[in-house]
């Protein structure tokens, strides 16, 4: 959407994102062939800028001589467009991050295909990521809305090998490729934070586009009491955590609550527990159906194993209370059921980590475990080959006399040797001296060589993550955020509440689409009402601060913290009552606090005429600081020239308006005190 002064803003309604209203998004996206040309131009630029292998620190360091301001300017120019038409130029510059990430993908493919040049392609890959980071951080200070709407969130289609690829945005592409340098940039993280909070949401009419939540600055409780707000990843995460702890509590009561040898029928808690498990299974099957094999990951398989064990236990439990003639008695089925259910305890407790990974410590720990599991594949592959070879040798020794005598003990001993519990006694009287020689070799290889290889692999994986812990954690959170916004459901029924949706699906199919949507809306409002009330209270307080920021012409996420080094930041939300008729009390209190703080500070500094630092001191400080003028200059001089006068004019207007509002608030405060 284009404002009166030519700036781009996120659309705030579904209708603005309809195909017939593409102009309201600022401009139409470039065609797939045009995006391919931009990507080829950027690849040519990186090839020339990085002709040889450089030290990675020379590329990623601040004010790098390799990725100089001139390179940044050339990257913008590689997008083409009319330099005299800002809208036309921005249209093609909007794909620059997407195209650079595609270049990264191409370099990764080349590094795999041409191993002899892998180091060079990895260096170019890093240079492409760093250039993305520089561009994102530059646009964050110039045009935040353009960064979010066009560069990171808009989905583009590129033509590769004469075929149009699936639409993707830069946010998804960087996360899928694990580009930690790009993900770790401040603008990227800021965009993720807005999506995580639900400030930017998917368009209800077209899930491939994003819009700004239109209730963000609404200061009434009822405007935020809306189940649509549950689409925000932060609230879905909270709901999943709540249901996970409830699931754990129910499991504990069920598995440790049996106090009789007699077979008892299903009680209320046990029934609710198995309903929870059924809801989780249904959710996994739904996601597998819509997403396919891409849904399968370590944690998904881990959860599936948990649900499968509990399902077996539920089946055995049903057998124990069903009056059927079976091989075993009801008591035996009941005993088997509780024993199988007990085996799920480590899984049920460990799955909590999946929902607590948003905490930095747990998130980093999970990333370390993930890397260790990947590294251990090498160990287990080698171990498998070694075990197969020695097992075949021992079985050959056992069958040399035409019969097999100790096959079972041999296999058992070879297996427990991996755990350090192997015994030489099994082979003392078996095919001397061949069996002993074989086992000595096996024991040495497993205990000395392979186990030390495993330790070294784990140490490498740990060090790799710890050295890059912050970026790895941010990449993990990016993946977590995308899991929520890529969910197939338009209505949020968090497991096990998805069973409600299943039971009501026949009714939804019968009703007209609008009536079905209204019914679903009503059901979600009733089911989630306690949680929606908490959301409303939280977001209403945030809305007052956002409204204050917009009055001050600041970004919505400004003034979240009251820092001691800035006397004019922060917001006094304590002065806002949830049911107060005066919705501007917090704004007034904040304005008065700021003016009072500045006045007190100014008065304290003026008590001693010799206290004030001379202006010359500031000039000397600037002189002694390192000079990065050539890096700090805005290389898009045309844009700077156009915006300079406009910024000055707006600054004057804001200062005048702030002064008027401050005086007015002081007068109102005096008037209220008199009354």
Swiss-Prot record:
InterPro entries: LHD_YVC1, TRP_calcium_channel, YVC1_C. GO terms for cellular component: fungal-type vacuole; fungal-type vacuole membrane; plasma membrane; vacuole-mitochondrion membrane contact site. The keyword Transmembrane applies. It is a multi-pass membrane protein. One of its GO terms (biological process) is calcium ion import across plasma membrane. Its main location: membrane. It holds the Pfam family YVC1_C. The chain crosses the membrane at residues 237-257, 296-316, 336-355, 377-397, 406-426, 437-457. The modification Phosphothreonine is found at residue 636. Residues 1-236, 317-335, 398-405, 458-675 are cytoplasmic. Residues 258-295, 356-376, 427-436 are vacuolar. Keywords: Calcium, Calcium channel, Calcium transport, Ion channel, Ion transport, Membrane, Phosphoprotein, Transmembrane, Transmembrane helix, Transport, Vacuole. One of its GO terms (molecular function) is calcium-activated cation channel activity. It is found in: Vacuole membrane. Belongs to the transient receptor (TC 1.A.4) family. PANTHER family: NONSELECTIVE CATION CHANNEL PROTEIN. Required for release of calcium ions from the vacuole in response to hyperosmotic shock. Present with 1310 molecules/cell in log phase SD medium. This is Calcium channel YVC1.
């Amino acid at each position: 959407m284009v404002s009166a002064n030519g700036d781009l803003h996120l659309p705030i309604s579904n209708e603005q994102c309809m195909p017939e209203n593409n102009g309201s998004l600022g401009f139409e996206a470039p065609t797939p062939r045009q995006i391919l040309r931009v990507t080829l131009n950027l690849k040519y630029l990186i090839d020339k800028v990085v002709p040889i292998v450089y030290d990675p620190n020379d590329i990623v360091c601040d004010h790098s001589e390799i990725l100089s301001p001139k390179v940044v300017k050339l990257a913008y120019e590689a997008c083409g467009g009319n330099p005299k038409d800002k809208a036309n130029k921005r249209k093609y510059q909007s794909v620059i991050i997407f195209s650079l990430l595609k270049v990264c993908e191409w370099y990764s493919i080349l590094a795999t295909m041409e191993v002899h040049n892998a180091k060079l392609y990895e260096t170019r890959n890093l240079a492409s990521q760093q250039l993305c980071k520089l561009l994102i951080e530059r646009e964050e200070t110039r045009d935040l809305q353009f960064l979010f709407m066009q560069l990171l969130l808009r989905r583009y289609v590129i033509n590769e090998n004469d075929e149009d690829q699936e639409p993707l945005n830069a946010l998804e592409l960087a996360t899928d490729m694990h580009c930690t340098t790009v993900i770790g940039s401040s603008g990227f993280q800021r965009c993720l934070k807005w999506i995580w909070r639900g400030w930017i949401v998917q368009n209800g009419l077209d899930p491939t586009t994003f819009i700004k939540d239109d209730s963000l600055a609404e200061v009434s409780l009822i405007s935020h009491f809306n189940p649509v707000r549950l689409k925000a990843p932060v609230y879905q995460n909270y709901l999943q955590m709540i249901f996970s702890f409830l699931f754990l509590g129910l499991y504990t009561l069920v598995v440790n609550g049996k106090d009789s040898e007699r077979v008892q029928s299903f009680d209320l808690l046990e029934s609710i527990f198995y309903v929870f498990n059924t809801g989780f299974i249904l959710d996994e099957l739904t996601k597998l159906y819509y997403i396919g094999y891409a849904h399968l990951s370590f944690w998904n398989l881990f959860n599936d194993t948990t649900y499968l064990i509990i399902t077996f236990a539920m089946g055995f439990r049903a057998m124990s209370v069903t009056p059927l003639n079976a091989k075993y008695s009801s008591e035996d089925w009941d005993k088997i059921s509780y024993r199988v259910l007990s085996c799920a305890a480590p899984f049920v407790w460990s799955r909590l980590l999946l929902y607590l990974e948003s905490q930095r410590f747990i998130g980093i720990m999970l990333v370390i475990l993930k890397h260790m599991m990947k590294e251990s594949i090498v160990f287990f592959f080698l171990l498998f080959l070694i075990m197969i070879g020695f097992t075949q040798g021992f079985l050959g020794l056992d069958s040399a006399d035409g019969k097999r005598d100790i096959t079972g003990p041999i296999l058992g001993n070879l297996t427990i040797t991996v755990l350090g519990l192997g015994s030489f006694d099994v082979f003392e009287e078996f095919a001397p001296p061949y069996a002993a020689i074989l086992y000595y070799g096996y024991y040495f290889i497993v205990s000395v060589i392979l186990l030390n290889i495993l330790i070294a692999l784990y140490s490498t994986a740990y060090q790799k993550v710890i050295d890059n812990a912050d970026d790895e954690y941010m990449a993990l959170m990016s993946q977590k955020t995308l899991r929520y916004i890529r969910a197939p459901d338009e209505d949020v029924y968090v497991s096990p509440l998805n069973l409600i949706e299943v039971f009501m699906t026949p009714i939804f199919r019968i009703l007209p689409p609008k009536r079905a949507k209204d019914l679903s809306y009503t059901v979600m409002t009733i089911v989630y009402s306690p949680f929606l009330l908490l959301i409303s209270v939280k977001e209403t307080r945030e809305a007052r601060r956002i409204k204050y920021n917009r009055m001050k012409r600041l970004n919505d996420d400004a003034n979240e913290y009251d820092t001691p080094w800035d006397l004019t930041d922060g917001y006094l939300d304590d002065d806002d009552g949830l049911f107060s008729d005066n919705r501007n009390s917090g704004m007034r209190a904040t304005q008065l606090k700021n003016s009072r703080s500045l006045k007190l500070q100014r008065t304290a500094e003026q008590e001693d005429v010799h206290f004030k630092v001379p202006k010359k001191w500031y000039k000397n400080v600037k002189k002694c600081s390192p000079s990065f003028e050539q890096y700090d200059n805005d290389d898009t001089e045309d844009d700077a020239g156009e915006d300079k006068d406009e910024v000055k004019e707006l600054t004057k207007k804001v200062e005048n308006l702030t002064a008027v509002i401050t005086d007015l608030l002081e007068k109102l405060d005096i008037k209220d005190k008199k009354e």
